[in-house]
């Protein structure tokens, strides 16, 4: 086996691991929703969508036969994670500055009208407000944990993509 084959095999294994981590994060969110009764807000649901996208792209990338296909899916993962960073940062800002609450979240009808909210309402249906602050986990609010997760996904995948850009063709 040459170095390119070994590198591609390692990338695929890491993509499967990344997808499983994203699914575990979604399972954790569902645990908080159904066991701890922490209703998801529109920004929570949008973050769930980004974790699902990352998992889907990672599984697709793991099944790619070519380095170029892996690189494309890794680029999509980085874009999804970057969008997740923005969403989680906004959510954290809203929770840390709740002064402008009106009791209605304008994003709710938009998020609830997306097809997955009809297909899997228990996972993707809005039930809470973005400014509702639930107890922190190890001193960090839930949007803070999502922000950390998205950064920990985006940075290594982007570095891997840049490092292997010539070898994964």
UniProtKB/Swiss-Prot annotation:
Transmembrane segments: 15-31, 50-64, 72-89, 145-163
Main location (coarse class): membrane
GO biological process: protein folding
Cytoplasmic side: 1-14, 65-71, 164-169
Entry GO terms, CC: plasma membrane
Any single Pfam family the record assigns to this protein: DsbB
Cross-referenced PANTHER family: DISULFIDE BOND FORMATION PROTEIN B (PTHR36570:SF3)
Protein name: Disulfide bond formation protein B
Taxonomic source organism: Burkholderia pseudomallei (strain K96243)
Gene: dsbB
